[in-house]
């Protein structure tokens, strides 16, 4: 792992951290057993196969 050679100022640290933004999970519509649900894209296949209980929220 890379280690810094010098101490980074508080202002530089905070401005660097401020660039990072969390993105909301994109929800995709899927129809399972005649009902429409919105699930994250990474769970789309599992929802179609019935591996996820979509009624439980």
Curated annotation (Swiss-Prot):
GO terms for molecular function: structural constituent of ribosome. Residues 1-19 have a biased composition (Basic residues). The keyword Ribonucleoprotein applies. GO terms for biological process: translation. Pfam families: Ribosomal_L32p. GO terms for cellular component: large ribosomal subunit. Residues 1-20 are annotated as: Disordered. Keywords: Ribonucleoprotein, Ribosomal protein. Belongs to the bacterial ribosomal protein bL32 family. This is Large ribosomal subunit protein bL32. The gene is rpmF.
């Amino acid at each position: 792992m890379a280690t810094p050679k010098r101490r980074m100022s508080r202002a530089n640290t905070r401005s660097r951290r401020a660039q990072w933004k969390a993105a909301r999970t994109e929800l995709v519509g899927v129809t399972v057993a005649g009902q429409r649900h919105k699930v994250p894209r990474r769970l789309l296949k599992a929802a179609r196969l019935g591996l996820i209980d979509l009624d439980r929220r």
